């Protein structure tokens, strides 16, 4: 006869890997063309002047310059790059 009960199983014990989303270059910081400014899911913040949108909704700089966040039309947030 066994002296211990069976170990059983659990439905817990796993976790997803971190996705490292968020702002990578704050407003006022100087960036080069191609620098990632923001990683996000969906387009909570849209690209403005001199900023591009990647296929995973990443916003990046198209020119060298300074990052500027602003509220666009209908209270939509936008990111501009002011050329230096």
Swiss-Prot record:
Q: Where is this region: Disordered?
A: 1-20
Q: Give the family this protein belongs to, as stated in its UniProt record.
A: Belongs to the bacterial ribosomal protein bL27 family.
UniProt-listed GO biological process terms: translation
**Keyword RNA-binding among record annotations:** no
Q: Keyword Ribosomal protein, does the record have it?
A: yes
- Its recorded name reads Large ribosomal subunit protein bL27
What are the protein's GO molecular function terms?
Answer: structural constituent of ribosome
The record's Pfam families line, in alphabetical order, gives: Ribosomal_L27 (PF01016)
Entry keywords, A to Z: Ribonucleoprotein, Ribosomal protein
Name the lineage: Bacteria, Pseudomonadati, Chlorobiota, Chlorobiia, Chlorobiales
Query: What is the organism of origin for this protein?
Result: Chlorobaculum tepidum (strain ATCC 49652 / DSM 12025 / NBRC 103806 / TLS)
For this protein, the record's NCBIfam families field holds: L27
What Gene Ontology cellular-component terms does the record carry? ribonucleoprotein complex; ribosome
Q: Read off the InterPro entries from this record.
A: Ribosomal_bL27 (IPR001684), Ribosomal_bL27_CS (IPR018261)
Gene3D superfamilies in the record:
2.40.50.100
Point out the gene that encodes the protein. rpmA
